[in-house]
Amino acid sequence: MVLNIWFNRWFSTVSHYMDMIRNNPDQQAFVIYGTHPNPDTVYFKKCDVSFIEPDSKGEEYLQFCLDFCRQHNIDIFVPRKENVLISQNLASFEAMGVKVLVCPDGELMALMDNKAAMYKSIEEHNETGHPIVTIPTYRVINNAEAFKDAYQELTSEGSRLCIKPVVGEGASGFRIIDDKADSISFLFNTATSPKISFATAYKILQKQVHFPDLMILEYLDGYEYSIDCLAGADGTLHIAIPRKKGKGRIREIEYNEELLVIAHRMADQYKIPFVFNIQVKYKDGVAKLLEINPRMSGGLHISCLASVNIPYYAIKLLLGGAIEVPRPTYGVKATYIEQPVILSKGSVLTKA
């Protein structure tokens, strides 16, 4: 049976996941659908069928998703955009027979989407005597004076600080507070940088009486790891693969017992199904949580060099299939290069 699978507004690296799903060990056939507002989206090259989707959000976008699934007889939907809202309306998709690769617990999805709420939840659990992972020192602020107070409090403890939105994805809004960012030498000798001085940040934040919740927290200066996880429908963890981010584009698949324990504790507590990603970073030898992403991560294809086809196994588990849990190949060091991709010359895609 050929299955129609749809990816909506993903990262460009979803191209790799499409390849892995298509080239699966069970020889399961798929027709891959892809949508994005940008007609030059690179992953359209990997799709059998592609459409330009509307640049909408919220309930309007949810309705688009439901209509698209109905019109194209979608069997499997792998959402990125509006995945929290989609999770909260899963019954509407299931009523059409559509399997959705998303955590079915809408409240848990909303919790993970809010970094401050997730931090608080983990802190409360840590206090029970069964710690999951260390949380960085942080404060949540929504006005300039609160930012100033939090900055003075945390710097008095000797911490370098950074800021990031409570609700956001990737590195959007992330800044390292460094007063050297206002110097002439920094201007002349530094390319694109996430650094911003306290004075500049404070001046910007003063432009509004209130702004969306922002976290100010200790900057973690050690190695960063992404732990890509595969779990069953009930949240039972099958595989966890720690991926170390080295200098530049160097990545290492590392057997790290401490991080594997964190992955198991997270899975035991929150029961996140199918596929998720835990990001941690070290400071003074302690791994501290950055965030949890209840979806395939942008760098999952690197983790799959451990000889585990996580995207396909996640789909198979979603469909109720059983998997033979493979043993990851640790010790892989990898990098990646830019590769030119010729887009279809003069092609015009149909709007969905």
Where are each of the predicted segments found?
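Residues that mark the start of a beta-strand
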Residues: V2-W6, R160, M215
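Active-site nucleotide/adenylate-binding loops and adjacent lid/helix of ATP-dependent enzymes
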Residues: M109-D213
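Short, charged, surface-exposed secondary-structure boundary motifs
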Residues: Y43-K45, Y61-Q63, L108-A116, A171, ...
